Amino acid sequence: FCLSRGLGDVYKRQAIRKDLSLRPVEGVDGTANEGEILSVLHKYGITGPSVVLWGTGKPLREFLWSEEMADASVYIMEHVNFEDTYQKGTKDVRNCHINIGTGKEITIAALADLIVKETKYQGKVIFDSTKPDGTMRKLTDVSKLHALGWHHRIDIEEGVHKMYQWYLS
């Protein structure tokens, strides 16, 4: 789901939108192929009898299906004008950004459990609390996005299922 300013620039050149640009907040850099992903899984021991995850498993994360990132981005470019992004009747133009996400969070431990159940993994998941957890919470406020008419449709459970089915095929 690696959209960049370049995509926004191309979209603008096509004269569809002229007043918005899109930038990813975080995610895969867009260059990984299936072989690289599998080698990373192997490198970190995800093919063995146990998986060691850094931290306590308590941090909360939000996940968005990649195609929905694309869908939301196109929706914004086609349906949202810059003036829709700030409060009317004020001379201040503030808080004009639009967060794209689900607004729903899950702990790393719960996500690991979900993946274990989906994949029927028989090994053990071990949390190494001597390693850092990272930021304890990463959640986007999607209230503006919802007010503008776009909502995600694929929850984390369905996303994990779809990803695993893709991997198997």
Task: State where each predicted segment sits.
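Single conserved hydrophobic/aromatic residue that forms the stacking wall/gate
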Residues: 1-11
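C-terminal substrate-binding subdomain of Rossmann-fold SDR/epimerase-dehydratase oxidoreductases
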Residues: 9-169
